[in-house]
Regions:
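Short hydrophobic alpha-helices and adjacent helix-cap/hinge residues
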Residues: 1-318
């Protein structure tokens, strides 16, 4: 009788022609750094292990950390293609880099913006190529975040938005402007593509804005500490898409649970390693969204957050 562990190994080996001496290779192109994305990657690895895949035993996972540098994702994607990995797992602009590097190696998106609108897949139900995984609807999220910001800071009139337009689609920038206008907020979108751009933008904000919206992606995530430090020093309330910004000292965040997304990416990877084709795996969307509020940051900013808003929070940092 086969144990469950040996059965899992047998199934995975069968998918690759009984190559027991040469386990499949997963190329994990991490758009961020170990500091910004480490917990998410750990969730992926843990879920993959639960599904029967142990790194170094019946699978080999090659990690590459781009630390928010787009040029690095391009380089690493090319390396994985040359290495002939069996699956590439990535997120954000890493998905684009991987797609540009190969049309044949399966690509699993752990988190990406609107994959249909941005042309990566034909539809969520039938991706129509080598990309599948998790996709987010950022336009809707931008509107929701600004509504939350208005609930917390009713008198907000001027908004600065840090946006890396090199990786953020035009419709997402339009969504920020449109939602702001609907709420009678004047939005100033600041284009940032490097850490130096972030420093320059933050240096101009003191006294010039009522709040700061940070479009959360690998570049801003890699520089979250300097963003939060500068904003707090200038007494500027902040809103983000990742909870990690709030645990680092930011005011509020609203967005998907990325631990959950990366764990679900492992499930896509498992299916592909067992023989499924990306086009047969419909893309999925987040099911868990979290509102995180940092009361300590609110007090330092002199803000009083209503009980009504606090009751909506999934987590309140005292």
């Amino acid at each position: 009788m086969l144990s469950m562990g040996s059965l899992a190994v047998g199934v995975s080996a069968a998918a690759y022609g009984q190559q027991s001496a040469k386990p499949p290779i997963v190329g994990f192109l991490v758009a961020g750094s170990p500091a910004s994305h480490g917990a998410w990657v750990a969730a992926f690895t843990q879920r993959l292990s639960e599904l029967g895949w142990t790194n170094g035993r019946n699978i080999k996972i090659e990690y590459r950390w781009a630390a928010g540098d787009i040029s690095q994702t391009t380089k690493f994607a090319a390396e994985f293609v040359q290495q002939k990995v069996n699956v590439i797992v990535t997120s954000a602009f890493g998905v684009v880099a991987a797609k540009e590097a190969t049309s044949t190696i399966p690509i699993v998106s752990a988190a990406y913006g609107d994959a249909v609108a941005n042309g990566l897949v034909k539809s969520l139900a039938r991706p129509g190529g080598n990309v599948t995984g998790l996709t987010i609807q950022p336009v809707e999220l931008s509107s929701k975040r600004l509504e939350l910001l208005r609930d917390i800071i009713p008198n907000v009139r001027r908004l600065a938005a840090l946006v890396n337009t090199h990786v953020v689609a035009a419709q997402e920038v339009i969504a920020i402007r449109t939602a702001s206008a609907r709420l009678n907020i004047d939005a100033n979108v600041l284009d940032i593509q490097t850490a130096q751009d972030i420093e320059a933008a933050m240096a101009t904000l003191a006294g010039q804005t009522d709040a700061l919206y940070v479009y959360s992606e690998p570049l801003t995530n890699a520089n979250k500490d300097k963003i939060i430090k500068a904003a707090n020093a200038a007494k500027i309330p902040t809103i983000f898409g990742f909870r990690e910004f709030v645990t680092a000292g930011g005011l509020i965040s609203y967005g998907p649970n990325f631990i959950d997304l990366f764990a679900r990416a492992a499930e896509f990877t498992d299916k592909i390693l067992r023989g499924a084709k990306p086009d047969d795996l419909p893309m999925e969307q987040p099911v868990k969204f979290e509102l995180i509020i940092n009361l300590k940051a609110a007090k330092a900013l002199g803000l009083s957050i209503s009980e009504m808003v606090l009751t909506r929070a999934d987590e309140v940092i005292e």
